């Protein structure tokens, strides 16, 4: 499309029609007698796109795969989107559902403190970190 300033919608429509027909004709063999019909068809098609028809969309709220209460088990968390069981939901939500934990909590009306990690898994990781000495201040070397 050219970089000209358009006065109104009709000028834009004519400009777009010309650009589309020119691009089409440069790559296809079109007899001269069919050119007015092609221009008319493209113009008509573009005219129909300027006023979108109003469509009433009735979207039902998605139902969770399991109840929120049953989704948090000691050894796993069940994804409300697909019903899969996981120790940690964050990576699954990102890769399979393109959601952040915040978006997930908002979609399913979950509490801000709804866990993204199974309780037993969180406890095991915490225990391992404490055994390694993480979270403690270093002793001064003197």
Curated annotation (Swiss-Prot):
Any one Gene Ontology BP term: regulation of DNA-templated transcription
Zinc finger (C2H3-type): 79-97
Pfam families tied to this protein: ROS_MUCR
InterPro entries associated with the record: ROS/MUCR_sf, ROS_MUCR
Keywords: DNA-binding, Metal-binding, Transcription, Transcription regulation, Zinc, Zinc-finger
Family, similarity comment: Belongs to the ros/MucR family.
Protein name in the entry: Transcriptional regulatory protein rosAr
Gene assigned in the entry: rosAR
